Amino acid sequence: MKWSQVLEDPALQNLPYKIELNEWGNIVLSPASNKHGLLQAEISWFLRQNKKNGKALTECSINTSKGVKVADAAWGADDFFNRNYLETPYQEAPDLCIEIISPSNAAQEIEEKINLYLSQGAREVWVCDEEGFIKFYTSQGEIEASQLFPNAPKKIEY
């Protein structure tokens, strides 16, 4: 299945799950809790308030070598949007991709997503756990603080 088919299929609209495609085009569903949604909203608000030369977005679809993955939140510089605008899915990752861990996520799955986003051009990946604690990653591995958002909190209060 292709991402455009997922978007056009009426049976796949308004599901209470996040949809991604694996490398074989199979649909992968991930249920999200209200806590997940609240963390997503708080992070997106922080991104909008703290960087003026780009845009924040949620549910950001990115084509990767392992299928279409959907970052819970993302931020792209103006240059990213000048190149890609609203292409769906993006063929390159925005500057920052953020995953919010759900109980159904395995550690290996999150590690794979970090690597996939970075290999598609993300400069940073943030991983937020269910309690709001954030870890920051670049292609060099885990870093102490965000380089893109130096004032990023290490914990999202909700």
Which ranges hold each PLM region?
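Gly/Pro/Ser/Thr-rich low-complexity, intrinsically disordered segments predominantly at protein N-termini
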Residues: 1-158
